[in-house]
Amino acid sequence: MIVVIGIFYLYPVIDVFRLSFTNATLIGDNPVYTLSTISNTLRSPQLPDILWATVIFVGGSVIGQQILGLAVAVVVVRGEKRGLFGTTILRTTALVAWVVPGIAGGIIWQMLFSEAPYGALNSILRLMHLPVVAWLSDPAIAPWSALIANIWRGTAFSMVVMYAALKSIDPSLYEAADVDGATGSQQFFFITIPQLRAAMLVNMILITIMTLNTFDAIITLTGGGPGRATEVISLYVFNIVFRNYDLSGGSVLSVLMLIISLGLAFVYASFLPKEEQQ
């Protein structure tokens, strides 16, 4: 089993590291080992803007998915306890977004954000006698449009994680709080949130890594434009390798993504409660 894991997971990572020290391309032969690719790629004038777009996209997605996922999970759990109608429908509706492929999700949101005469959101704005919005062509608005689409897609995953964590909380904690006269908001902030700390941090690690690697929905929705307003690092890697045929440059950026992912994972993990604190 270890050998199989090594072949299918470890070897590609090692090979990406190796390629980052070469001048390999998709159409060239006999690459030579050099450090110039690393320096040229990291000194690219486009890289700072792309990293900033990535920070906005990943940071906004993590915060939005965490908050909305927790909100939906709380509503579902409380609805189940009270036997409210529509709880199952809400849970199923949230999960639908998760199973929709990224390309399909991008197309759906492209139709919603379309600036054509019959674009869904702009049609609603016209009915309300409000000015239409350049959802995808304005460099200041397009990143937020991509962010909304990604939050919609990823909220379901956070909801599943938070739902499982909420169901595992000992009900006696709430019973004791009721006896002590704690309000609903006090129970939420002093019982629910502390009990969810580990689940929230693990969820943040997972959705950060998933969002950092997201490019399918963006390439369908905006193609990285207008300009480079929505070109995150994962899409930049795709463009470098498959449009510029620069395999070594893409490898350097892939290693950079790996370092960022591991760094953020270690930061999140450092806040996980120790066993004696649980």
Regions flagged by a language model, labelled:
Residues M1-Q278:
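A structural signal for multi-pass alpha-helical bundles of membrane permease subunits
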